[in-house]
C-alpha cells in the first residue's frame, strides 16, 4: 500500500498521529541489493587539528573561558568570532551531564564516523546510518533526508551511537546553561558527510544476502553491563546482521547492543567513539583474542547501533578481567578495548555457521507523533535558545510556545519465506530496558527489598521495587509485541529526546534553590534521567505508537 495517510481522532489520542505505510515489495523474486560506506566526522581541519576559533588564554588553563551571566565579573576571554555568531565555537565534549566546569577536547584518540548501509529490494530502498555523536535532533535528520531526496529512498534512519567522547551536537554542553555548545561548522560537516556516506552506499549497491545472529558476551570475563537505576533489568543480548555479496565477501555488519559508550569516563579530554571503536575494528580486522582464541575479521563496514541504553545501562562501576583473569582498571582505554573486543567476538561467533536467509520482502512502517515537552529544566534551556526546534500546539507549528515536540518511530520488517525473520524498531531517545523486556516497578505497598543481583553489580543489595506513582499502569512491553527470531531495538533513532522514562516512575527535577534530582515517595532521590528527558508522558506516547505499528 503506497502513500496511505491517516489522521487519528484528537479526542481519543489527544495528539495527531500520521501513519505512513511506505512502499514495500511484494515480489518474492526481486533481488536484494546492499551497499555500505563510512566517512569520518571528526571535528578537525585539513591539517588534522581540532576545529576551534582562536582565543587568548589569559589564565593559561589550556581552555577558553566564556562569560557567565551568573557571574558578572567573569567577562570571558577574547576570541576571534570567525562566523559572527557572538559566541566562541570549539570542541565541547558531550555526554556527561555534570555540574562542574565544562570541558573541551584536547585531542583525538580515535576518529568519529558516519557509517551507512543501503538495502534495496523491489520498491523498497532503506538507508540506515549510525553517527558517532551523543544524539541528533529530528530537524537535523529532516535536513539530511532532504539532501538525499533525489535518490528516491523509501526511508532514512539516522541513529546516534550515543558516544560520550564526541562533541556537542545538541547544544546542552556549552560553557554554561546560557551558551549553546554546538559548532556550526561541525554540524554542517556532520550533515554533509552523512549525506555523502548515504550516496556512496547507494552507489555501491550490489546483489547481496543477509544472515543474522544473536548472543550474550561471555560472563566469565566479568559483567559487561551495569544497571544504575532500579529496577535492575539488563538487556545484554547482542543482535547482529551481516550483508554479504554473492561471492561471500562482507558488505556490512550491523551490531545492536545496549551499554552506554562511556567506558573511559569524564576524565578523558580525547575524542573517541569509546568501545564501539574496538568493536567495529575487531569485526572488520580481527587480530585480538578472547578466551585464548584468535579472532579473524570479516571485512566490510561494521555499523554499531545503540539499543535500550536508558535506565541506566553502563559499563561503569563494574570490574572486568583480561585474558589472564586480572582486573582491568576502571575508566581506562584498556577497559574500553576489552569490552569492544568481547562484543566483537560475540558478534562473530553469533554469525558463525549462520547461512544466509532468503528475504522476500522488506517493509518499512513509520509514524510521526507529538510528545509533550513538560520537563521544566529542559524547557527553560530551550527558551534560552540552547537547542533549536519547532514546538507544536494541536498539531500545528507554534514557534517556541507550543506544548509538544514532533518526532517519529519506525518498524522495519524483513520477511523470509515463512514470515518475519527479523524486525527493527526505532525509538526517538534512550529507552529503558524494562520497556523492551518487562520488569517494570509495580509494587504498591512496599518500596524496598534486598536482592542478590544488586550485590553482583557491586551494590549493597538494596533495591527499590515500588514505583514513584503506583497508580499509573506500566506501558506495554515492546519485546512482547515484536516478531521474528531477531529483534533489533534502535535507540536514539532519528531524534534524541533524552531518557524515555516509564510514566509510573517519572519524578521531575527540582529547580530551586538549585538544580537537583527529584525525590519519590520511597525517599529515592536518584532520578537523574528525568533531568535529561523531554517529559513525563513521552514513554506512553512512544510505546503506544509503536504498538500500533507492530500490529
Where are these regions (language model features)?
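Sec/Tat signal peptide C-region and signal peptidase I cleavage site
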Residues: 24-28
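N-terminal secretory signal peptides that target proteins for export/translocation
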Residues: 1-10
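Bacterial N-terminal signal peptides
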Residues: 11-23
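Conserved beta-alpha junction segments in alpha/beta enzyme cores
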Residues: 29-160, 167-338, 351-551
Amino acid at each position: 500500500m503506497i502513500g496511505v495517510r491517516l489522521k487519528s481522532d484528537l479526542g481519543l489520542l489527544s495528539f495527531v498521529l500520521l501513519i505512513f505505510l511506505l512502499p514495500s515489495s511484494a515480489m518474492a523474486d526481486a533481488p536484494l541489493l546492499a551497499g555500505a560506506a563510512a566517512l569520518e566526522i571528526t571535528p578537525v581541519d585539513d591539517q588534522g587539528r581540532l576545529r576551534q576559533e582562536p582565543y587568548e588564554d589569559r589564565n593559561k588553563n589550556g581552555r577558553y573561558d566564556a562569560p557567565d551571566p551568573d557571574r558578572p565579573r567573569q567577562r570571558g576571554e577574547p576570541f576571534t568570532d570567525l562566523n559572527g555568531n557572538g559566541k566562541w565555537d570549539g570542541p565541547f565534549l558531550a555526554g556527561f551531564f555534570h555540574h562542574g566546569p565544562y570541558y573541551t577536547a584536547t585531542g583525538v584518540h580515535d576518529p568519529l564516523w558516519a557509517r551507512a548501509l543501503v538495502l534495496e529490494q523491489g520498491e523498497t530502498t532503506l538507508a540506515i546510518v549510525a553517527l558517532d555523536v551523543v544524539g541528533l535532533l529530528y530537524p537535523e535528520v529532516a535536513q539530511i533526508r532532504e539532501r538525499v531526496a533525489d535518490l528516491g529512498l523509501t526511508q532514512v534512519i539516522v541513529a546516534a551511537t550515543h558516544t560520550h567522547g564526541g562533541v556537542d551536537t545538541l547544544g546542552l554542553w556549552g560553557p554554561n546553561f546560557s551558551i549553546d555548545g554546538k559548532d556550526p561548522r561541525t554540524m554542517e560537516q556532520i550533515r554533509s558527510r552523512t549525506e555523502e556516506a548515504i550516496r556512496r552506499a547507494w552507489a555501491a549497491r550490489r546483489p547481496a544476502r543477509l544472515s543474522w545472529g544473536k548472543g550474550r558476551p561471555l560472563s566469565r570475563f566479568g559483567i559487561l553491563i551495569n544497571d544504575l537505576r532500579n529496577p535492575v533489568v539488563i538487556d545484554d543480548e547482542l543482535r547482529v546482521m551481516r550483508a554479504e555479496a554473492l561471492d561471500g565477501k562482507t558488505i556490512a555488519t550491523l551490531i545492536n547492543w545496549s551499554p552506554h559508550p562511556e567506558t573511559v569516563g569524564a576524565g578523558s579530554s580525547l575524542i573517541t567513539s569509546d568501545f564501539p571503536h574496538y568493536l567495529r575494528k575487531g569485526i572488520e580486522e580481527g587480530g585480538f583474542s578472547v578466551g585464548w582464541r584468535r579472532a579473524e575479521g570479516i571485512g566490510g563496514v561494521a555499523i554499531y547501533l545503540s539499543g535500550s541504553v536508558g535506565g541506566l545501562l553502563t559499563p561503569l562501576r563494574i570490574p572486568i578481567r583480561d585474558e589472564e583473569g586480572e582486573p582491568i582498571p576502571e575508566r581506562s582505554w584498556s577497559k574500553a578495548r576489552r569490552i569492544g573486543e568481547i562484543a566483537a567476538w560475540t558478534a562473530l561467533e553469533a554469525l558463525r555457521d549462520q547461512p544466509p536467509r532468503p528475504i522476500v520482502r522488506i517493509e518499512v512502517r513509520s509514524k510521526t507523533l507529538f510528545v509533550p515537552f513538560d520537563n521544566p529544566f529542559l524547557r527553560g534551556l530551550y527558551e534560552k535558545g540552547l537547542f533549536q526546534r519547532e514546538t507544536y500546539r494541536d498539531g500545528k507549528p507554534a514557534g517556541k510556545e507550543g506544548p509538544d515536540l514532533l518526532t517519529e518511530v519506525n518498524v522495519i520488517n524483513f520477511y523470509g519465506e515463512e514470515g518475519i525473520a527479523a524486525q527493527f524498531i526505532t525509538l526517538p531517545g534512550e529507552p529503558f530496558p524494562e520497556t523492551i523486556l518487562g520488569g517494570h516497578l509495580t509494587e504498591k505497598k512496599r518500596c524496598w527489598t534486598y536482592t542478590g543481583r544488586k550485590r553482583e553489580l557491586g551494590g549493597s543489595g538494596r533495591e527499590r521495587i515500588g514505583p514513584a506513582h503506583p497508580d499509573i499502569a506500566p506501558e506495554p512491553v515492546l519485546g512482547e509485541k515484536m516478531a521474528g527470531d531477531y529483534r533489533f531495538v534502535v535507540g536514539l533513532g532519528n531524534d534524541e529526546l533524552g531518557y524515555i522514562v516509564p510514566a509510573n516512575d517519572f519524578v521531575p527535577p527540582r529547580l530551586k534553590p538549585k538544580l537537583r534530582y527529584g525525590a519519590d515517595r520511597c525517599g529515592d532521590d536518584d532520578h537523574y534521567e528525568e533531568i535529561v528527558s523531554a517529559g513525563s508522558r513521552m514513554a506512553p506516547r512512544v510505546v503506544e505508537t509503536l504498538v500500533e505499528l507492530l500490529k
